[in-house]
Amino acid sequence: MKRLIVILLGCLHLAAVHAQEFGGQLISEWQWDMNQHTNWLNQVRLDLNLPLWHGRGAIEAATLHLANIRHEALIDDWQGFSNIEAGNMLAAIAVLGYSHHWASARVFVGVRNVNEDFFTSPVTALFANSSCGIVPTIAASYPIANYPFSGLTFYFDVTRGRFTFRNSLCNGVG
């Protein structure tokens, strides 16, 4: 038993040596429809960044874990009123791919959610009335990788002074 524990800890140590950044975020909300129904929603996001090539490149990974106590939504509306309500889901891939950085540009190739770069801020999940996570006409009219789904993506951005130009080529919902 000791040998097994030592081997497992050694493997974890080797994996942790290369992990430059590992983080998590928990967002929880309680819903009430002002009648008899309530719901408790939780979203856990785990992020991992493994630097390569002396910090110029990186393997990026992020997963979303969603849980709520009700199987159906509180209101009969396809948009809902929560930025994190998406049904129960274990380990949905939000980001998985390779990014490379230059002085003023960045390229990413892999699986990515469109909300990662364009339609959200670090505090978006804390507000109600999500409009499906992004601009509602985009979410309703085009098959894009909207929250909580991701799709194959080629993304790049270029920064000049105060301006940043961003562009993505996505294959739709993954």
Segments from the language model and where they lie:
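Short, glycine/acidic-enriched capping/hinge loops at junctions between secondary-structure elements
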Residues: M34-H37, H71-A73
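Extracellular loop and loop/strand-boundary signature of outer-membrane beta-barrel proteins
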Residues: Q31-N35, G80-I84, A139-Y142
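Short catalytic helix/loop segments, enriched in acidic residues and glycine
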Residues: T38-L52
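Sec-dependent N-terminal signal peptides
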Residues: L4-H13
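Short, intrinsically disordered, charge-balanced linker/junction segments flanking boundaries
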Residues: A15, V173-G174
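Transmembrane beta-strand segments of Gram-negative outer membrane beta-barrel proteins
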Residues: H18-D33, G57-A61, S130
